[in-house]
A protein has these predicted regions:
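Conserved HGGG/HGGXW glycine-rich cap/lid loop of the alpha/beta-hydrolase fold
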Residues: 10-68
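Conserved alpha/beta-hydrolase catalytic His-Asp/Glu region
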Residues: 128-136, 146-205
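Active-site loop/oxyanion-hole signature of alpha/beta-hydrolase fold enzymes
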Residues: 2, 8, 40, 50-98, ...
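Short beta-strand/loop motif that positions the catalytic acidic residue
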Residues: 207, 213-215
Length: 269
């Protein structure tokens, strides 16, 4: 597959000519437009890359393969292929939610390509066990996935307000709900299973990229203890607790997210 095919497959767009390149990766049930309010702030100073995961947005749905995308590794391979198509050196991957782990896996595979990571609301594992708090019991995850399988639109309407938070701004959860509802139901179900059953805890120590963990308050998907765990287990990581609440600060608090990313890219001496 040539560079043009990869760019078409993942609906890749590139803006700006600065250095380094910032690659924005969206989360479950979303597309690249969920980063628009943040990414636009960097186009004058950086090269900004936006893309859709296969199965989302305006990606090539015919490229979706259940075998390849049966784990996050398939999405990480796509991210590396996008980097190769764009000939990226020393890029920064900025991942929301599950794309934090996708970015981590891509950086492990190509540490020369992705030398810095910004993780927004990351979780390496959503399910609690005896020595780890992920935020959900296995039964809760199973019930969540069953609800999604039985009623995609109902799941979207019920979950969007909980995931978004910020109940005083209902337009935010409505935007997220529209995004959920626009995804292909079959692919969404498979991506949800891959996301919520993933366990990347053992991968964290292998991340050599300089990393920023951005943690929101009152995040039901990635609670504060999870962000602290991620930060503690990535060797070269720093942690920042945002004032923003909910799981989608790229929508609810783009200015604060922009400021945090800028501070990370230009640390004070």
């Amino acid at each position: 597959m040539g560079p043009g095919d990869i760019r078409s497959r993942n609906n890749v767009t590139v803006h700006g000519n600065g250095h380094p390149t910032l690659v924005f990766a969206h989360g479950f049930g979303c597309d690249k437009h969920m980063w628009a309010d943040v990414a636009a702030n960097f186009e004058n100073d950086y090269r900004v890359v936006l893309f859709d995961h296969v199965g989302a947005g305006q990606s090539d749905l015919s490229a979706y393969d259940s075998g390849k995308y049966g784990s996050l590794d398939g999405y990480a391979r796509d991210l590396v292929e996008i980097g190769e198509a764009l000939e990226l050196p020393d890029a920064v991957v900025i991942g929301h939610s599950v794309s934090s782990m996708i970015g981590a896996l891509a950086s492990i595979a190509r540490p020369d390509m992705f030398t810095q990571i910004v993780m927004v609301g990351p979780s390496p594992c959503y399910i609690d066990d005896e020595e780890y708090t992920g935020g959900f019991s296995r039964q809760q995850i199973d019930e969540l996935l069953t609800f999604l399988e039985e009623n995609h639109l109902g799941w979207s309407a019920a979950m969007a307000p909980q995931i978004m938070g910020n109940s005083e701004r209902p337009e935010l959860s409505e935007r997220l709900n529209r995004s959920f509802c626009s995804t292909d139901p079959d692919i969404a179900r498979e991506f949800a299973k891959v996301t919520f059953h993933s366990d990347n805890r053992n991968d964290l120590p292998m991340v050599k990229a300089r990393t920023l963990v951005l943690q929101c308050q009152q995040d039901i998907i990635a609670p504060q203890a999870v962000g602290e765990y991620v930060n503690a287990n990535i060797p070269n990581s720093e942690y920042r607790l945002l004032e923003a609440t909910g799981h989608c600060p790229n929508l609810s608090a783009p200015e604060e997210v922009t400021e945090a990313i800028r501070d990370f890219l230009h640390p004070s001496s």
